[in-house]
Structures are given as structure tokens and as C-alpha cells.
Regions:
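Beta-propeller folds
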Residues: 1-224
Length: 224
């Protein structure tokens, strides 16, 4: 009988995929409570995540959004996005790594630095691209009432009216020369407190509270 044992090196113990097997990520209920959605790796590529659903009534699991439907090819990540994924411990993940429910039949998906609004219904999901910029849109959310999609771009907070598509900057513009940004979670919040957002909607969609981050007194230490 051939020897099927494998030597487990330290590199393999901490590499992807996990030896304990795949686990669902980003588990959420839909607003109407009829579905449980989660991110799941593909059988042929566990690092590439698609959005799946569990129908509460029937108990059936099915693929909801194929990541390649939104973006067939992987985009080059920005340095800020790479750092954020490291802090979230998803540095090796591809495809859909985050999403936000809007209404019971709409989902906001950030992918490749842009935002997509996916409408669910009979047949294939309908995709509407909300942004198409060279900059990365991060920390995307749908407002509590479902009227706006909000996000951070280049250190400033923005919102898109989903009815007419108008985009508005909600905060002052960032001042990179002074190391000042708005609506972002600074390094300590992300790394030590596991807080990855820097802004919060009021329940009625009328107000947004956001952080002003001043890192001008933080020393720059080269990372080797």
C-alpha cells in the first residue's frame, strides 16, 4: 500500500486552504429574513469567494452571485486595500470578500475597487455598476432605509443616491499632505479594536456621523 502521508511544514500549517476545511464567511440574514447569505470558496479554488444563499423555508443552498459575473478578471489591489485585507486576515482571498444587503432584493458588492448593485429576482441577477474610477471605493454600505450607497474614496466620505445615481461628497476632501482623512478607521482601530469603519448612518438616513483622522504626528517607520 503506497504511503499517503504528508509532511506538514510550518509554511503549510499556516497556508491556505486551512487544514480544518473551508468555513463560511460573512454570514448575514436578508432584510426580510427569508435567506441566510454567506461567502464560500469554490471547489477548484478555495480562495475565490462567491456569494451563496440558504433558503430558510426550503433548506436549500444555492449560488446567489458568481464573482466572475461582476468582474471576470482580478483587479490589482491598492496598497490601502492590501493593508485592510491583512488586518481582516483575508489577504489571500479573491472574488467577493464583502457585501451589504440593501432592500430584500438588492445587494451592494464592492469588487476590484468599484461598487456594484445587484438586483435579485427571477432568473439571473441584474447588475448595475455604481462607480468606475481609478481610485478604490472602500467600506461600502447601504443606508438603513436603502436609499443611498455610501463609501470612502481617497480619504473622503461619499454617498450615491440609488434613485437617480447622483454622487455627493459628504465630508471635506482629504488632505494627504497633512495626513488628514475622513470616514476611515485608523490603524489602531483596525488592528487592535477590530473596527473597520469610520462612519455611521442614522436610522432615518438623514444624518451620517464620521471620524476625522489626523495622523500628522505619527512617525513613519520603514517596513522591510
Amino acid at each position: 500500500m503506497p504511503d499517503s502521508t504528508t509532511v506538514l511544514t510550518p509554511e503549510r500549517l499556516y497556508a491556505s486552504p486551512s487544514l480544518s476545511g473551508p468555513a463560511p464567511r460573512g454570514v448575514k440574514f436578508s432584510p426580510d429574513g427569508k435567506r441566510v447569505t454567506f461567502l464560500k470558496g469554490r471547489p477548484d479554488d478555495q480562495d475565490r469567494l462567491d456569494l451563496w444563499q440558504f433558503d430558510v423555508q426550503t433548506g436549500i443552498q444555492s449560488l446567489l452571485i458568481n464573482s466572475q459575473l461582476l468582474q471576470p478578471h482580478d483587479a490589482e489591489l491598492s496598497e490601502a486595500e492590501k493593508a485592510l485585507r491583512e488586518r481582516k486576515r483575508i489577504a489571500g482571498a479573491k472574488g467577493i470578500v464583502d457585501y451589504s444587503w440593501g432592500t430584500a432584493d438588492t445587494i451592494l458588492v464592492p469588487l476590484g475597487g468599484d461598487l456594484y448593485l445587484v438586483s435579485l429576482g427571477e432568473g439571473e441577477p441584474q447588475v448595475r455598476q455604481l462607480t468606475d474610477t481609478d481610485a478604490f471605493e472602500t467600506d461600502a454600505k447601504v443606508s438603513p432605509k436603502g436609499r443611498y450607497a455610501s463609501f470612502v474614496r481617497e480619504g473622503a466620505l461619499y454617498a450615491i443616491d440609488l434613485e437617480n445615481g447622483n454622487e455627493t461628497r459628504l465630508s471635506p476632501a482629504a488632505e494627504p499632505d497633512k495626513a488628514i482623512s475622513y470616514g476611515v478607521a485608523e490603524f489602531v482601530a483596525q488592528e487592535e479594536m477590530h473596527r473597520f469603519t469610520g462612519y455611521w448612518w442614522s436610522p432615518d438616513d438623514h444624518y451620517v456621523a464620521y471620524t476625522r483622522v489626523d495622523e500628522s504626528t505619527v512617525d513613519i517607520i520603514p517596513r522591510f
